[in-house]
């Protein structure tokens, strides 16, 4: 859970604006933390399932009476863009990043993480696009 909180705080501290840029920044922040701590990466890869991610998202942020997931939803709202099923959107991005970056970080296979990142960002943009609500559909909120 600390990875999520640290990534969120880094977005705010660096004044990243726009939900897509914020999401990319948070994913990059988490992946860089995992890259710098291979033991944590191994632990995460062996012990994390969606249930563990969900539990981390539901826990309250340290020293605050708010959940990370609430802050995630706030970032979406501040970005003035609506997404269908923001929970599934986050699930898709987390699963994509965790499943594709493990070997890039630990073994530099098929390429090192730095080389893979632009492709990961394009894939995340595709996920964002596929979950984006039509502007005519915003009244259904």
Residue ranges: model-predicted function:
Residues 46, 76-124, 131-141:
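Hydrophobic/aromatic-rich alpha-helical bundle segments in the mid-to-C-terminal region
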Residues 8, 21, 33-56, 70, ...:
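Amphipathic alpha-helical segments used for helix-helix packing
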Residues 2, 6-37, 93:
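Hydrophobic alpha-helical connector segments
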Residues 25, 29, 71, 119-123:
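Alpha-helical elements of Rossmann-like donor-binding domains used by nucleotide-donor carbohydrate transfer enzymes
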């Amino acid at each position: 859970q600390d990875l999520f909180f640290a990534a969120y705080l880094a977005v705010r501290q660096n004044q990243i604006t726009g939900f897509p840029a914020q999401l990319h920044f948070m994913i990059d922040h988490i992946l860089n933390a995992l890259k710098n701590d291979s033991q944590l990466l191994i632990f995460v890869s062996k012990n994390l399932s969606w249930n563990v991610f969900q539990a981390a998202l539901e826990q309250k942020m340290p020293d605050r009476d708010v959940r990370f997931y609430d802050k995630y939803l706030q970032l979406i709202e501040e970005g003035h863009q609506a997404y269908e099923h923001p929970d599934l959107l986050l699930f898709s991005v987390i699963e994509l990043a965790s499943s594709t970056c493990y070997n890039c970080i630990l073994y530099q296979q098929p390429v090192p993480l730095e080389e893979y990142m632009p492709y990961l960002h394009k894939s995340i943009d595709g996920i964002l696009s596929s979950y984006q609500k039509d502007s005519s559909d915003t009244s259904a909120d």
